[in-house]
Every structure is written in structure tokens, then in C-alpha cells.
């Protein structure tokens, strides 16, 4: 296995099944009647979790052919040389989440996979903290104090592990949330955005958690004033809305939405209710980038992921207004999650 290899431009800039109601869908991205020559797309590099190669892979959106050697600017998987145990290496299946964050002028990445999580130095890929954790981990976020937040869809919890206390720290605090799928730190409101189901009412929700206590003994408390019931079931992704700190991207099995932190309401995203979107974000230009499983597209793409029904070989690009622009296809890939590689919290 290889270390993370990143070009100089990149630094400037989740595989687990979603086991909930992952049925077939007849909605497909609108395609232009005329096939145009692929265009380079400016913006941050894109991180993809690839179950086929069992690697986190970094791609340059300015390169139009992602099967070309210069398209993939970085890749990572755990190795003993990087400081990981044999158990962690064997469990890593390509990732379910990957976020790059800069803290005190040092850049790290937080990542999750089905049954392990880690914080690594970026771009070296060296282990900072890691742990084998059951529960079908779907999302990870590095907190400004060095701790790590995790969401487990089968474990039905949000946890904060005290990674700030050492590379092998196993202390954590837990907030019960059924089918938990996403964690995202908000530096303005100083809270953690999460998606899942209310344990008591079974409602599908987006909500915010305050992190109190100390770095060594954190506490999680829901900020109920920010809770919103999702318009459709099975919340999945929560990501930053580049260019507007008052908004968030939120996806579910039934559609994708924009959450307004002031009004505490959800509205339909410009892409107009695509379903089963596993990862979604926008570039500073406003361009939208997302991934949907090939199994949920009709017709299914000729080049597609045949290994499972929750991944894809295709990354789709849309204008800020929701018009399909084009795609990048990687032969043999099984991408589950896409992340805009912006190291800044927002």
C-alpha cells in the first residue's frame, strides 16, 4: 500500500452500506441531447472513498479524463509504515468519510470506515489517532480541540472520542441517535450538526449538538432549537454550503435539501429531488458535486460499480442553478462519498 501522494496545489485547497431503505429509484440526472466535450472544472480537489481499490483517492476536477494518470493526485490507505495495526489495515475498506481540517496551522484529515476511524497527518498520511470501532461508522469530523466526532448508523449513536488526549485514547461521550449518518462542526454556532432518527419518536431529523465539558471529558447536549424534521426519510449527508455560512447541504434517501440556520427550515436543493445522494457539496463557484449509487439510476450507466448497490463509478457536476453539466467516470471504481477538500471549517 502507498502513502498519500499529493501535488502542491492540492494542499491549498465513508465503505459501509447505507442499510436503510436502499431501494431502486427511477430518477436519473437530466442528460443533454448533445454530448459535449468534457470541460475542466475549477475548484478545490475532490476526495473520493473507493471501495474497489480500498483507498481514499484525490482527484483534480480540472482534468477531464479521470482515467488519465494526472487525474488522481493522491491516494491513501492504512499501512504499518504509517503507524496502523494489522487489524486496522484489514478492516479498512476504502472509507465512508474523509475531511481535511487545519488546526493551529497544522493540517490533518479525519476519516471513517465501516469499523475503524482515524486522524492522520495531511498530506503525509501518518497516524495521529485511530481505533477499531463497531457500529457501521458513516461519518467523521475533527474538532478544533483535537477530538474526533463519529456517527454510527447501526450503533445508533454520535460519539466524541478524546483523541486530543493521546494516539490511543479510547474515552468517549455518546449521544443516542438512531441511524446516525453525519457529523459536521459549525465554528460560528460552535455545535455539531448531525442526522439520524429520534430514538423515542423515530422521526427523521437534522439537529445540532453542543459539546461541553472538557477536552478530556466532553459532554454532548442537543440544541433543540435547531432541530428540523427531514422532508423525506433516512438522512444521510450534511456538508458545508460554500459561500454562505448560514446554509447547509442535507441529503436523504428521498432528496437533497438546503437548511437555513436562521429560519431553521429545509427547502429543496436546486438539483430538484435526486434520490439516494450519498455525498454532496459545492465549489466556491457554486458548482454542485455529488454521488449517487449506480443501482439507483435508470438506466444504469454502462460503466458502473457492480460490487455493491450503494456505490458508483460516476461523479456528477451541476450548475449552481441545478442544471447537469457533466460527469467524471473512473473505470472499475466504487465511489461511496465525495468531499470538497477545503480544510477550513465554515
Name each model-derived stretch:
Residues 1-40:
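Bacterial Sec-dependent N-terminal signal peptides
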Residues 42-44, 105-107, 145-147, 188-190, ...:
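Short coil/turn segments that connect the beta-strands within blades of beta-propeller domains
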Residues 49-87, 111-125:
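Beta-propeller domains
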Residues 51-53, 61, 112-114, 152-155, ...:
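Short loop/turn segments immediately following the C-termini of beta-strands
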Residues 60-68, 162-167, 209-219, 261-268:
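Short loop/turn segments immediately following beta-strands, especially the blade-tip
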Residues 72-90, 125-131, 167-175, 219-230, ...:
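A short beta-strand motif characteristic of beta-propeller blades
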Residues 87-101, 134-143, 177-184, 229-243, ...:
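Repeated scaffold domains used in trafficking and secretory/extracellular systems
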Residues 233-235, 239-310:
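Intrinsically disordered, low-complexity segments enriched in Gly and acidic/Ser/Thr residues
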Amino acid at each position: 500500500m502507498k502513502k498519500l501522494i499529493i501535488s502542491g496545489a492540492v494542499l491549498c485547497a465513508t465503505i459501509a452500506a447505507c442499510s436503510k431503505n436502499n431501494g431502486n429509484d427511477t430518477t436519473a440526472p437530466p442528460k443533454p441531447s448533445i454530448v459535449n466535450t468534457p470541460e475542466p472544472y475549477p475548484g478545490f480537489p475532490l476526495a473520493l472513498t473507493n471501495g474497489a481499490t480500498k483507498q481514499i483517492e484525490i482527484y483534480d476536477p480540472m482534468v477531464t479524463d479521470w482515467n488519465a494518470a494526472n487525474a488522481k493526485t493522491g491516494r491513501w490507505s492504512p499501512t504499518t509504515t504509517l503507524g496502523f495495526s494489522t487489524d486496522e489495515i484489514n478492516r479498512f475498506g476504502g472509507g465512508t468519510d474523509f475531511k481535511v481540517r487545519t488546526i493551529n496551522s497544522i493540517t490533518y484529515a479525519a476519516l471513517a470506515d465501516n469499523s475503524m476511524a482515524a486522524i492522520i497527518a495531511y498530506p503525509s498520511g501518518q497516524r495521529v489517532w485511530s481505533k477499531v470501532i463497531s457500529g457501521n461508522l458513516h461519518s467523521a469530523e475533527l474538532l478544533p480541540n483535537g477530538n474526533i466526532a463519529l456517527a454510527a448508523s447501526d450503533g445508533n449513536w454520535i460519539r466524541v472520542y478524546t483523541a486530543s488526549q493521546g494516539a490511543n485514547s479510547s474515552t468517549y461521550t455518546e449521544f443516542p441517535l438512531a441511524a446516525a449518518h453525519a457529523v459536521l462542526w459549525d465554528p460560528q454556532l460552535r455545535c455539531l450538526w448531525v442526522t439520524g432518527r429520534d430514538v423515542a419518536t423515530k422521526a427523521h431529523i437534522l439537529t445540532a449538538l453542543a459539546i461541553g465539558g472538557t477536552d478530556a471529558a466532553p459532554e454532548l447536549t442537543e440544541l433543540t432549537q435547531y432541530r428540523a424534521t427531514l422532508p423525506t426519510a433516512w438522512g444521510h449527508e450534511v456538508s458545508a454550503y460554500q459561500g454562505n455560512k448560514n446554509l447547509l447541504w442535507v441529503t436523504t434517501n428521498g432528496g437533497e435539501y438546503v437548511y437555513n440556520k436562521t429560519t431553521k427550515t429545509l427547502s429543496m436543493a436546486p438539483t430538484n429531488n435526486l434520490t439516494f445522494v450519498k455525498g454532496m457539496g459545492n465549489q466556491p463557484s457554486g458548482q454542485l458535486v455529488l454521488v449517487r449509487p449506480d443501482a439507483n439510476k435508470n438506466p444504469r450507466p454502462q460503466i458502473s460499480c457492480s460490487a455493491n448497490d450503494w456505490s458508483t463509478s460516476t461523479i456528477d457536476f451541476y450548475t449552481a442553478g441545478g442544471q447537469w453539466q457533466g460527469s467524471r467516470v473512473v473505470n472499475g471504481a466504487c465511489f461511496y462519498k465525495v468531499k470538497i477538500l477545503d480544510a477550513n471549517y465554515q
